[in-house]
């Protein structure tokens, strides 16, 4: 590799000696590759159009013969062939470079970025091409592209060198184009419904809005520990208190947690809050939002995912957590009187009981995660959660011990989370103080009491429905991607081992 780099570096020096800058400033393009392919799709073989076009892109393949060369040029839109003829270049570039064809053969490589001008022709073999009259090497690449990138078994190398992955894999570029369309469609749908997006702080004095371990940083001037936000919830609720009735924020969230095919410490979510609404309203919003985005981006409500077809046509299935656990395990949590009876029933069903399980609510959730979650392939709203695992949700209006909360599961993954939001400041204080006690007892995912948030609630927050959607997981679904790292352009990875460490 170092020899190849040295050879290419020498070519860059030769270009400078010839008076050509190998790292150009600009190039005027008249068309993209895709535009030319569409515009001249009906051009017959052997014909040429006497209209000058200009294009730029990366050389992806080159075949050089005696007095003729064929390059494949790739820009963001696609590829097109370059037809490079010695005599034609010698005549058209005589004033610029009398040895234009020789220098083209000797000083260009696959991976270089080239600008060309010429006319469009279709070869006798039927390949649409640009018959080049003038070219310029716009960027001399020093690193060769991998010959068999598709066959690499080291998947992490694709993530580490995403720029190369994007160059050689058009389907990867399409994933990120689709991601951009998804986020744009989400924003458009919410704005059409009267919501506005307001940005909230990334650096926060108190971590809150979720149970998660935060990243901690330090502000030198204020001499203050700060947290990277683990949710946008508490600040968006302050906006509801302040008089905004429909707000959302789509942005980055940071949680100091593990890495897996479903989790990245830095991820994207959207949180939506609507005054005078409840979790039933949020279910309807979630259905219509995701269905509309799928139709706009995928073109269908029947979405293929890893060999399965996911039907996103509303209405989606609704079931309580207790109903789903009963169906999967035979355990009727609604009839259990105390934790001791619950543990006995769970053990009798052959489900391992975690050591730290202080109440029936957490035991129910444990059974759900063990036996139900992975089976929820088609869109399912799991509703009515235990109060013990939902510190920010309003008590259920007719079911003691439960809260008005749902989570949306698709392909066995949580995709959205929603509450009828807790607006009682006294109840909220009790729950946050219980969470703070958990933190003091060693729970790294629990948080301290956010006194300013409680003060905001004491000024009066209207009935509110809240919703959070994991954007990365939604993009995974709508791009048929098995790993979250496939839909994050630059995912966090473990440091690469040095050559000495690898040998050891």
Swiss-Prot record:
Classification via Pfam families: tRNA-synt_2, tRNA_anti-codon
Native organism: Synechococcus elongatus (strain ATCC 33912 / PCC 7942 / FACHB-805) (Anacystis nidulans R2)
Record protein name field: Lysine--tRNA ligase
An annotated Gene Ontology molecular function: lysine-tRNA ligase activity
Catalytic activity line of the entry: tRNA(Lys) + L-lysine + ATP = L-lysyl-tRNA(Lys) + AMP + diphosphate
Subunit structure: Homodimer.
EC number: 6.1.1.6
GO cellular component, one term: cytosol
Residue intervals passing through the bilayer: none
InterPro entries documented for this protein: Aa-tRNA-synt_II, aa-tRNA-synth_II, aa-tRNA-synth_II/BPL/LPL, Lys-tRNA-ligase_II, Lys-tRNA-ligase_II_bac/euk, Lys-tRNA-ligase_II_N, Lys-tRNA-synth_II_C, NA-bd_OB-fold
Enzyme class: ligase
Note accompanying the cofactor annotation: Binds 3 Mg(2+) ions per subunit.
Lineage: Bacteria, Bacillati, Cyanobacteriota, Cyanophyceae, Synechococcales
Subcellular location: Cytoplasm
Record's keyword terms, sorted: Aminoacyl-tRNA synthetase, ATP-binding, Cytoplasm, Ligase, Magnesium, Metal-binding, Nucleotide-binding, Protein biosynthesis
